[in-house]
Amino acid sequence: MTTIVSVRRNGHVVIAGDGQATLGNTVMKGNVKKVRRLYNDKVIAGFAGGTADAFTLFELFERKLEMHQGHLVKAAVELAKDWRTDRMLRKLEALLAVADETASLIITGNGDVVQPENDLIAIGSGGPYAQAAARALLENTELGAREIAEKALDIAGDICIYTNHFHTIEELTAKA
């Protein structure tokens, strides 16, 4: 598994992920980039789950973004509908965390599109640890979104055996 965390604060949104890929109990690669930019760099997305499945979902999500002129929520709902109802897509095992300037969402294969409280997302095996750390930092510090995401990933990497300390971080800034 993995850890993906997204934090939104003071006009900045960040999605960050670790780089560990495992096959069963064996680490196969330590520098996988599980976070990327989509739709002309206006959307950032991260995945937890099977790498090949996630890349397929990224491609489909980018097509949905193009169909809906970059409208994140509409594209997410359409992807979730297809993911749930299409016989082949239903077999894909991954979770997506996506964000643009205004919204942060979790998209699941069950057809769920969730906009979490406080615009804080944490998915994957280290998600609960990263979420707890990020929430504590959001509530008790003035750190920026990027610093919070980095610290949350570090803490998850210290606790979760399926999360490492190689980070990929993407950030968007809201236009003034």
Swiss-Prot record:
Positions annotated as active site in the UniProt record: 2
Leading EC class: hydrolase
Keyword Metal-binding: yes
Lineage top rank: taxon: Bacteria
Keyword Metal-binding tagged: yes
EC code: 3.4.25.2
Subunit and partners: A double ring-shaped homohexamer of HslV is capped on each side by a ring-shaped HslU homohexamer. The assembly of the HslU/HslV complex is dependent on binding of ATP.
Family that this chain belongs to: Belongs to the peptidase T1B family. HslV subfamily.
Record-given protein name: ATP-dependent protease subunit HslV
Source organism: Salmonella typhimurium (strain LT2 / SGSC1412 / ATCC 700720)
Primary gene name: hslV
